[in-house]
Amino acid sequence: MIFTVPTVLEPSQLEQIRSILEKAEFVDGKLTAGWHAQLVKENQQLKSGQIQTQLTQTVKDALLKNALFQTAVRPRKIHSLLFSRYEVGMSYGTHIDNGLMGSNFWRSDVSFTLFLTAPKDYEGGELVIEGADDEKAYKLDLNSVLVYPSSTLHRVEPVTKGTRLVAVGWVQSLVRDASEREILFDLETARRAIFVQQGKTPEFDLISKSIANLLRKWAE
């Protein structure tokens, strides 16, 4: 399931992050790529340290407070978050994200990209997600997040004007299978709609029972 989460950060948080990144030190993005992804990765990433840790926590906290993100992703652990910068000519060719990341070998079930530059401020730089028989390009509004399965091949097109700033990260979900997460999301959406329209009905209780039992069956 691919979906968008709009307006993730508070305006003050967004302004602070953009201001800090404007003056911060970036390093070669190849340093955090797998050996095969290094062949196609041409970008820069915020240097590890106190600033990176601070900004990472701000983004994590915002995502964990977001109801749509919680319901659709079922996060166990948000991990490996990076702040990436693409200048003119930079891109990230077709690649697959590593299945396990970091020293704790967190699983990457779900990937996300938080757009920190408005579309009008740069050209190119679309995030393209490849499917079995098609592909789709994404270039979201400032402060929006694109969430997609980590199992997909994807790429970032070359930036031809301006600068593209994003935060990218991964999630180990309580439910590793994408189709199972989608079933739970659909049931949760239906349950909430019933509650808004009719309150706590027998139908609401049946869906609640199914969600709870499926989580017992699928969660890990």
UniProtKB/Swiss-Prot annotation:
One of its GO terms (biological process) is intracellular iron ion homeostasis. InterPro entries: Oxoglu/Fe-dep_dioxygenase_dom (IPR005123), PKHD_hydroxylase (IPR023550), Pro_4_hyd_alph (IPR006620), Pro_4_hyd_alph_FE2OG_OXY (IPR044862). Binds 1 Fe(2+) ion per subunit. 2-oxoglutarate binds at R164. Its cofactor is Fe(2+); L-ascorbate. Keywords: Dioxygenase, Iron, Metal-binding, Oxidoreductase, Vitamin C. Fe cation binds at H95, D97, H154. Its EC number is 1.14.11.-. It comes from the Bacteria. PROSITE patterns: FE2OG_OXY (PS51471). One of its GO terms (molecular function) is L-ascorbic acid binding. Residues 77-173 form the Fe2OG dioxygenase domain. This is PKHD-type hydroxylase PCC7424_1929. It comes from Gloeothece citriformis (strain PCC 7424) (Cyanothece sp. (strain PCC 7424)). The lineage of its organism: Bacteria, Bacillati, Cyanobacteriota, Cyanophyceae, Oscillatoriophycideae.
